[in-house]
Regions:
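Acidic, low-complexity intrinsically disordered segments
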Residues: 1-96
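Conserved SAM/AdoMet-binding glycine-rich loop
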Residues: 83-194
Length: 195
């Protein structure tokens, strides 16, 4: 194992460790024409039919849930990708026949302050004319309002995962999940009303 590229907390890094310092790079859309030029099977993969292709709208999660690795993998600082770049990436995939999108964010709406970002993205998807898509995401049901729920449905949300880990507020607190079950229930009702 001495030659492996890994790091163990509390030990000196081994030679050959790969580590990328954070950079202030702006996220740009994937260039799927380029990807197809180096991976000829891309279109074969996309022709497979009913599936979701991942698109990331942001990285990071501000929460501190005791069991989750997202804050280790992506960090606690949320970095929102520019709406124009996310929509450009979706447009490229759409033009290649993709209609199913999975927003691969740790949380599509990680906190209430990101509600407007989510609304702006969904409005841009509408403005781009991507009206026959369906999409899915992980969401925290404590970070919704009625307008956002309606936009989610109007833009093709077909599936979402809400991590309601426990019906016990005490257990939610002990797991450091940071939400109120009553708020989650009320916002789930918003989603039901939105359709």
């Amino acid at each position: 194992l001495a030659g492996e590229r890994c790091y163990v907390v509390g030990e000196e890094p081994r030679p050959g460790l790969i580590h990328e310092q954070p950079a202030g790079l702006v996220k740009t859309a994937c260039d799927y024409t380029y990807i197809a030029s180096i991976w000829p099977q891309l279109d074969w993969y996309l022709d497979a039919g009913d599936f979701y292709v991942g698109v990331q709208t942001k990285r990071g999660c501000p929460h501190n849930c005791c069991y989750c690795v997202y804050t280790v993998v992506e960090g606690k600082q949320v970095r929102v990708n520019p709406v124009a770049e996310v929509v450009a990436e979706m447009r490229q995939l759409y033009d290649r026949g993709v209609r199913g999108f999975w927003f691969t964010d740790a949380q599509f709406i990680p906190a209430r302050r990101y509600i407007e970002d989510a609304k702006n993205l969904l409005r841009a998807i509408q403005a781009e004319g991507l009206s026959d898509i369906h999409w899915a995401a992980y969401i925290r049901a404590d970070n919704l309002d009625a307008e956002l729920a309606e936009l989610m449905v109007a833009t093709g949300m077909s599936y979402f995962e809400i991590g309601i880990t426990s019906g016990s507020q005490e257990l939610v607190r002990k797991m450091r999940m940071g939400y109120n079950l009553r708020t989650v229930l009320e916002n789930c009702r918003l989603l039901v009303r939105a359709g």
